[in-house]
């Protein structure tokens, strides 16, 4: 289906990005805490935006009119997948920093925030060019908030 195709395309892009981050999670996260490099996150976000806006009508159907269809739980499924990924990233960060794991409800909330960023964008911003400017700011906020949280929690231990 057209709506299912856009969902699959987004899921594939997310999975490819998550696979890269999984490999990076085995690296030196202390460096990431200092640099806050989010170029890969921004690049993937731009690809997702392009896919969403290229098929905006289908994306809007998925997000606003899928009740009662086989895709009714699509957003919840995206959040579930993101939560699993963020749990892995959070556990890698807290382990390397010698910290207690983050609460599951907190990791789940972060996942909602990530997906809600795109839902807000596609339902409220009509032009792809404006969405690209929006996502640059949103990505900066989310990535720096993520790393800032670990810097802050790490400093609280000392």
What is each model feature region?
Residues 89-142, 150-158:
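Hydrophobic/aromatic-rich alpha-helical bundle segments in the mid-to-C-terminal region
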Residues 1-19:
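An amphipathic alpha-helix adjacent to DNA-recognition modules
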Residues 13, 17, 21, 85, ...:
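Solvent-exposed amphipathic alpha-helical surface segments
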Residues 39, 43-57, 69-94, 105-112:
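Amphipathic alpha-helical packing segments from all-alpha helical-bundle domains
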Residues 18-32, 49-69:
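Amphipathic alpha-helical segments used for helix-helix packing
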């Amino acid at each position: 289906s057209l709506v299912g195709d856009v969902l699959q395309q987004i899921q594939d892009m997310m999975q490819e990005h998550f696979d890269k981050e999984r490999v990076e999670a085995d690296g030196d996260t202390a460096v990431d805490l200092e640099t806050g490099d989010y170029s890969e996150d921004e690049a993937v976000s731009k690809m997702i935006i392009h896919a969403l806006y290229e098929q905006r009508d289908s994306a809007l159907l998925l997000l606003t009119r899928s009740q009662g269809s086989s895709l009714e739980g699509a957003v919840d499924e995206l959040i579930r997948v993101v939560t699993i990924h963020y749990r892995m990233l959070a556990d890698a960060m807290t382990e390397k920093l010698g910290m207690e794991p983050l609460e599951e409800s907190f990791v789940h909330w972060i996942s909602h925030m990530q997906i809600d960023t795109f839902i807000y964008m596609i339902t409220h911003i009509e032009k792809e060019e404006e969405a690209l400017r929006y996502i640059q700011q949103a990505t900066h906020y989310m990535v720096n908030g993520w790393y800032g949280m670990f810097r802050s929690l790490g400093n609280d231990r000392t």
